[in-house]
Amino acid sequence: MSARQAAHRERGSRSIGLDAVAAGGVIALGAAFAIGSALRPERKSDPVHRRATRKARDGAAILGASVLMDSAMEHFRGGFHNRAMVLAPATAAASIAASLAEPRPDRTGRLPRLGHALSFAVGAAGLGFHFYNVTKRPGGLSWNNLFYAAPLGAPGALAISGLLGLTSEALSIAPVDGDRTGNEALAWSLPEAGRGLALATGGSLLVTAAEAGLLHFRGAFHNPAMWLPVTVPPATGLFLIGEAANPTDSGREVTRWAARGVAVLGVVGTAFHVWGVHRNMGGWHNWRQTSLAGPPTPAPISFTGLAMAGLAALDALGSEERSS
């Protein structure tokens, strides 16, 4: 067999492999949404409470979907050389299903919490794997390794998805009227759950913006729009942390508009990344190569998921003034 024929066969097998990964990611995404929706019955509760809970859980699900597709593509590019690399997309799918499922009083209610806890644990372990991948290379924590080795903060998105899911669980079971009886005796009140979610979301926005800043710095901020993910989300994260510490009507309204801007930014950023893939040679006609070489298309929508969780936190924080 000639070298040209061998190269052609290798490209063909890789193309088939990427097709399988893409199809598997879509199937896993659809299955996660279907399973989670089936476990999500309508609940009779205060409209504000129900709306805040849905926003928080939908935000965690969107973040999980971003992690599922992004980790599947990036780990495929790495050839899944470590078998543990399969855990990231698999756990992200479980996180989506857990985020869409409503907590129940029976034993089935433990499954969503287990899914969120597993996502957090796998994401935290992934941070260790990626840190080792960066530091084991010549030069250690150098700019070159931070740019081109395993993305240092990427597994944190999976951990954040699990953290938001666990916090949304606390928000979901929070007693609305302040009376804590039975299973709610140890639960947070709705404003307390809102503060916890605001802190978790605010910190997550800061960390996610730092990861985006590193990669956009690698791209030399060649497009002025690349500054938006490193300015708007961190400011919103600080606003959320401030509201968690000292909630006010005026501050909450400013933070709400900032969070809406972050949600829009996630959609616009996805469009920019889709265009970035298109600009590579062959565009989307050559998606098997350009989708791996271009900017990660599933990444920006994570900002939308975090923004929804932030809006849920603001709704819960506002309940304190409405109930007083």
Region locations from a protein language model:
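Short amphipathic, positively biased membrane-proximal segments
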Residues: 1-324
